[in-house]
Structure formats: C-alpha cells, structure tokens
Amino acid sequence: MLKDQLRESRKLSFAIDPFEPGSTFKIFTAASALEHKTATINSTYYAEQGRMRVDNHWIKEAESHEKFEWISVADIIRYSSNVGTTKLAFDLTFPKLKETLKELNFGNKTGIEVPGESRGIFTEADNVTPLSLSNISFGQGIAVTGVQMMAAYAAIANGGEYIKPTLIKRDPNQVTVSELEPENANQLEKRRRVLSQKNTEDLTKALVLAVEKGTGGNAKIPHFQIAGKTATAQRVDKNGGYKGYVSGFIGYPVNVDRKFVIAVYIDNPKTGGYYGGAVAGPVFKNLAEYMLYKNKDISRLAEHEDNDYDLKKVKTNIDMVQVKEAASRSLTPGIVPNMMGLDKITTTNISLKLNLQVVHKGMGVVSSQYPPAGTPIGDDTVVKLEYSPPTYE
C-alpha cells in the first residue's frame, strides 16, 4: 500500500511540491485589498507607464509596449499588471496581505491524502521590504503547491467559502473505488468563510474579463463564461536556479451546474511560445470543454485542428512541475550564513528568518556573496548577493 501511495505522490508532484505561481497569484492580492477595504474593484492606480522603481530595482510589465497609466483593479487583473499589483500591495501593506493569504491556507498543508505534501515557502515575518512585498504580490519570492492554488481559487468560485480538498478516485467507468473517510464525509458542511460573497463576485467578474478581453483569451469557450488567470513564471531547475519558463492558467466556469477548477502548469513548453495564455490556456480550454460537454454534445471537442494541445496529447504535453527544495543549511543567529549556490526564494526565506538585510542582483543562483559566511551580523550589515545562471557539467 505504501508503495502505491508513493507512486501516486510522484505522479502528483505539481500538486504537492512548491513552485513560484507567478501571475496566477495576483488575484489574491486583489482579494486581500477588497477584504481590507483599501481598494474596490473600480479603484484606480497610476501604473507609471510600465515601470516603477522599488528599492533600487525596476518593477516592469511583462511587455515593453504595456505603458499603462491610470488603471482599475479589474484591469490590473485583466492585463496582469505587475506595477498595478505592486501599487495595490503597497496600499494594502504586508501584514494585511499575509492575513488574507493565511486565511486561504497558504503556508500550511491542505491535508490532502497524499504523502509528502509541502506547506510551500511562506515567510513568518511580520513585515518585509518593499521589494519583497512587490514580488510576493505578483507571485514571486513565494512558493505554493498546486493543491493550495486550486483550493484558494475554489474559495473564490464558491462565493468566499474555503473547503478542505480531498482526493477521490474513480475508475474509467466512473465506479467509485475510493470513498471519503468517515471523518471527511461531511466535508461540505465544514466549509469556512474566508472572503465576502460580494468581493468574490467582483473578483470573478475581473477574472472573466481577463479571459474575454485580456491575457486569457485562448481559454475562452463559446456559450460559457470562463473566469481565469494566466501566468508566465521563471522555471526553477534541479540545481535551484532559473532556466526556462513555467506557463500556467487556472480557471473555472461561471454559473454552471458542473462546478470545477482546473489548474494547468506546463514545464518548459517546447511549442507555442512560453506565455501562459498562449500555452496553458488552450490546454485548460480542452479539458474544461470535456468537463462541460461530457454527457452532452461532445462533438465540439474535435474542432481543434489548429491547436497543438489536442486532448489526446494533453497527457504527454504536460510535465507537472517538480521543484526540489534546496538542501537545508545550518543557520546561526547573529552570523551571516553561506548562501552560495542558492536561489532567490531560498535566500529570501533565510534572510527573513535571520532578520538580515539583503540586496539581490541578477538571476539564477548565488555566485558571489559579501560579506562572506561567518561574518557577525551588525545593525548596519547588508549582505550583497549576485546571481548567475547555473552551470552544468
């Protein structure tokens, strides 16, 4: 039995292992702002014409031509604005954002019945630097699991009620082979409210706008309203650095009897570019159409001759993201640790644990550190880390 469980765990690496969610995380920053009343869905922010200086770093939009000026919260989601999300987070402040994320169960295991589930990487600090807050607001510098993301999106789809996820198995003929354990049989009765229904309605409308008139256009399904969000995140490789991309899309149909959330993350896509809307969106569309038209008119599923991501190919085209957490290092309070070879998520987590000021430069893994490991930490100590792409033998 244990061997079977471990095999299932390996198959579900995307679901239970941590990864940077990228822009699919922006909706939770917006949710927190609405919950704490620092913004409404129609509040507007000046998006600095595409770039904004934060802690001597530039926060930029994904495309150089995206020079947004005044932009509403709904349009921040629609166009996936990094600058707009940063402004939203700065008004909100980290303690309030953290409160909402904790309510949505980020930083904790969901308790799904699969061994080896990660809690993700989420700071326990009471506050963070402006740059860290900016990065976290749009899904960088934080690591989550696929199950955490789907459960949190389901809370929005459920009108603000969070339901603990559980694993159900059925055979190809839909005969149940694994039922809910008795203690979970009343799972639906254990739902807890984490967001107001009014706010989730506004968030859903923004996500629908993102699909119908924004970055998620390739996930549109005729005759249905789809709420969803794209992501294009840097890919963490086996050595803890960044190489390539992870393309993502999470969404759900609105006002339907068959309710579901689908999360698609494609590791290092080889065709169709690498943007989440272009690569993961069509996969979501095919899977969602199957769910929506199942036992109805499924003839529509054959209408994808121009799409590389045919349903028959979905299984082979999706390699679930597997991120290996960097080997733990011994940390001594008051002493600068050795951060050579670590990625930015890990160094950020370490610096927060030690209350250490860090300046990051570059991308990849740490190739240069000053002052060196073993140096006593003073009140004015600032550790400068330079990152470079990892090398391979």
Language-model region placement:
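Beta-lactam-recognizing serine transpeptidase/beta-lactamase-like catalytic domain environment
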Residues: 1-22, 28-266
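Ligand-recognition elements built from short beta-strands and adjacent flexible loops
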Residues: 122, 223, 264-278, 282-393
